[in-house]
Amino acid sequence: MRSELIDVGTGSREVVFDLTSICEQFVTAEAHQAQGDGLLHLFVPHATAGIAILETGAGSDTDLLAVLEELLPRDFRWQHRHGTPGHGRDHVLPALIPPHASIPVIGGRLTLGTWQSICLVDTNVDNPQRQVRLSWLPS
């Protein structure tokens, strides 16, 4: 297995950050050594972010953030109370959007559907820098 930790600047706002091109580059560099087949695994080593596979660019990313705001309002109901008001919701996020995903790679290509993208979902406005671990598991 080969693994690489990448840094992602998410800024001080809620974001759905598309990682697909970064993942494609990583897979291209690794897949040639394994006859092109294997598994890409992503992991976010943070308690307040997750990985989602969804359509982007057609408003689905904005819709996801809106749904998360409805499900997890940024208010004072949360027992976890450090950081900005409502920050406790960010610690619940990984229970809904897990901090990991695995995507099969066949013939050196991610087997995503036509409209699928691999995204980092980050609602924590207190932490503008994130990391994502990409791991290549050859077949």
Model-derived regions, located:
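Active-site histidine-anchored catalytic micro-motif
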Residues: 1-139
